[in-house]
């Protein structure tokens, strides 16, 4: 209904909510969004900064989302501050048509981060060595090796906790899988989370210090993954969960 008036130029979205835990989209939601935006002539822009872990082509590529614009932040350069954007050939043609109708001129972009040599080197290295099928294969396998035993661990103890995975990124929460940010926030248990993180730190293991998010690195070993699962199980035994 919000798009029906035809006065909304674009919808900018992240395919997975990740700043309040990981909230996966419901089946069919993103496909419906694409269909509705096309019907009303609204452009669709996807931000993959937090979902590039899905694979070399990001979440959009893995799920055939077909956005009009694709943007990504520091993840594409291995964590170094960076941003890129791209668009379809149809959008390019529309841009060129607009430019052709205008007087000739010049434009440019000159900012503190523009043309940074370190950023460009990091981006090149990441594109050549990180965002490839060969590199992602062990990352995805490691994520599955982590996610499946964790879910089994919770089920064996009768805990209604969930495990979410977005490619090489895994997260678990202390409740059934949330459908929105409000449900994710309501399910947070800060004291339990802090106790778990401290338990792991004291045993030489560290996870992201907000939420229970883990990202499998290309060089992550199976032994390290298994040790993490084992210590989470030991923690649950210690606190009688």
Where are these regions (language model features)?
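Conserved N-terminal phosphate-binding loop of PLP-dependent enzymes in the Aspartate aminotransferase
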Residues: 1-241
């Amino acid at each position: 209904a919000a798009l029906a008036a035809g006065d909304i130029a674009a919808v900018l979205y992240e395919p997975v909510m990740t700043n309040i835990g990981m909230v996966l989209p419901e089946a069919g939601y993103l496909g419906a969004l694409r269909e509705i935006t096309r019907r009303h002539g609204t452009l669709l822009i996807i931000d993959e900064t937090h979902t590039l872990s899905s694979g070399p082509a990001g979440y959009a590529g893995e799920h055939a989302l077909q956005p009009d614009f694709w943007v990504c932040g520091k993840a594409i350069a291995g964590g170094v501050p960076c941003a890129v954007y791209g668009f379809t050939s149809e959008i390019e043609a529309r841009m060129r048509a607009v430019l052709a109708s205008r007087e000739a001129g010049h434009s440019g972009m000159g900012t503190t981060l523009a043309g940074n040599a370190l950023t460009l080197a990091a981006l090149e290295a990441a594109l050549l060595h990180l965002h490839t099928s060969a590199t992602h294969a062990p990352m995805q396998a490691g994520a599955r090796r982590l996610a499946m035993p964790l879910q089994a661990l919770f089920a064996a103890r009768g805990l209604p906790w969930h495990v979410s995975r977005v490619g090489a990124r895994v997260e678990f929460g202390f409740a059934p899988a949330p459908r929105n940010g409000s449900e994710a926030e309501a399910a947070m248990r800060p004291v339990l989370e802090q106790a778990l993180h401290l338990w792991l730190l004291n045993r030489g293991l560290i996870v992201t210090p907000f939420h229970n998010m883990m990202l499998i690195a290309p060089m992550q070993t199976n032994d390290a993954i298994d040790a993490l699962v084992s210590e989470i199980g030991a923690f649950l035994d210690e606190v009688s969960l």
